[in-house]
Amino acid sequence: MAKKKKSAHYSGIGGQAVLEGVMMKNKDDYAVAIRKADGEIDVEVDVFRGLFPGSRITKIPFLRGIFNFIDSLRLGMKCINHSAQFYEDGEAEETKLDKALDKISGGRGEKILMGFTTVLSIVLAVAVFILLPYYLSTLLNGFIRNDSLLAIIEGVIRIAIFLLYIVAISLMKDIHRLYQYHGAEHKCINCIEKGRPLTVYNAMKSSRIHKRCGTSFLFFVVFVSIILFFFIRVSNPVYRVLLRIALIPVIAGISYEIIRLAGRSDNILIRIISAPGMWLQKLTTKEPDEEMLEVAIKSVEAVFDWKNYLYEEFGYEVDESWMKDGALSDDSEEGTGEE
């Protein structure tokens, strides 16, 4: 069958980098591929059920973003813990806390710890990125009386903390490799969404930047929070803090709808609002090596039939001759791809 003109087609898959590996998710199925210390690739496939599987409330615009955000944190934490097990020094001994939790919860101690870790992560993120900028801006109350200017300063501080955090952790060796796997994840998705057979060569030529990336989502969270906090104000300092906490679900819901729209559209407005988040991905993704791409490809193939996808979306069947290096590959489009 004749091949259709190539353009980006939404695939529905997404994922994240984990320690020495990549997690890919397609609908309820997800796979975690890990490069073990001996060089072999371990692939685990499972089904993830959200907080309210099948419930209509998780489909309602703006509300769905809240549930999606929580589910992403839960799954992400689970996959990172799974990948960490491959690089622990020997078998980790079960602690007294583990035994006590298992006894009390009927063997659900690991899930309880995972839930606690997720909640703690959210609390720390709120403290650092929401409450700290507000507190620092209040230190200027004696010098600046204009509430609008203080709101702008709070937003600038929030952006500065966000950028400093990204830059600081990128200097860590392990995080640098995590960012390389992050780039591998993006390259694989961009490769198939551009209509190319998923090979190491084709993936390497694809962009490591993607519009549906979590980095872009976090940028929208910061941006939306600045706008909401600027226009929605109260005079009481305690109420100001409570208001910022109460608006977090609203911020997450709005940000999710923006990035969801960005992943399905490509008009000039979408490109403009997506640009800052995609620029930030220059910091949170790095160029992967071929072995990292092999891991990412294994993860994709465990949950997604990319050959059937190419046939349905681009109108051609993949044969073995196309799987050779350079087959159906365009020039590198670094910085222009979408996740």
Tell me what each language-model feature is:
Residues 1-88, 92:
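Divalent-cation
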Residues 2-14, 18, 22-24, 144, ...:
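Polar-ligand-bearing catalytic/cofactor-coordination segments
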Residues 4-18, 53-59, 98-114, 200-206:
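Cytosolic juxtamembrane amphipathic/interface segments immediately preceding
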Residues 48-49, 53-56, 65-69, 76-94, ...:
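Multi-pass alpha-helical transmembrane bundle typical of ion/small-solute transporters
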Residues 82, 121-146, 221-245, 252, ...:
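Juxtamembrane "helix exit" motif at the C-terminal ends of alpha-helical transmembrane segments
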Residues 98-108, 135-153, 232-242, 261-271, ...:
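Membrane interface segments of multi-pass transport proteins and intramembrane proteases
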Residues 110, 114, 118, 150-158, ...:
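Residue-level signature of transmembrane alpha-helical entry/exit and packing/kink sites
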Residues 113-129, 210-221:
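Select subsegments of transmembrane alpha-helices in polytopic membrane proteins
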